[in-house]
A protein has these predicted regions:
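Bacterial N-terminal signal peptides
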Residues: 5-14
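Central antiparallel beta-sheet cores of small beta-barrel/beta-sandwich binding domains
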Residues: 20-142
């Protein structure tokens, strides 16, 4: 009887582990450095650089997790993170100097240009920067 119970427990345990297996990441990898041009509704036109790094240990199936860093000369560094679902992604970013409340969330769509480079178009919203703000960025992987 003890053998039968042990066998049933072993089978049940293996089925439980198999049911929770995380699928491997199969989505596109957007890792790299992107040159960007932007239009901020308060600050006007700007240029910047975005660095994305895939966090494979936190990615699965078509869902990608990334470290995100936007660097804008004259303004500073905006570290954050990005979550992607196929070619769509959302980003959160915040200026390292938190006194200006310059932080926000963006949504973007990735595609490849005629040269085969990844690019994305982003809309962002900053709820507390200068009473609220939004803007756009277009970025191309270098």
């Amino acid at each position: 009887m003890r053998f039968v119970l042990s066998f049933i427990f072993l089978i049940a345990s293996s089925l439980s582990v198999a049911a929770h297996k995380i699928p491997a990441f199969t989505g596109p990898d957007f890792t790299g450095v992107y040159q960007c041009t932007g239009l901020d509704m308060h600050e006007g036109e700007y240029k910047g650089k975005v660095t994305l790094k895939l966090k494979k240990e936190h990615s699965q199936a078509q869902y990608g997790s990334y470290d995100f860093l936007l660097e804008v000369p004259g303004y500073g560094r905006y570290p954050g993170h990005m979550a992607a679902n196929g070619l769509s992604a959302a980003m959160h970013f915040a200026l390292e100097n938190q006194s200006t409340h310059d932080f926000g969330t963006g949504i973007s769509q990735f595609s490849k240009n005629a040269k085969g480079q990844w690019q994305f178009h982003k809309f962002y919203f900053e709820p507390q920067f200068k009473g609220g703000n939004s803007g756009f960025e277009d970025c191309v992987k270098q």
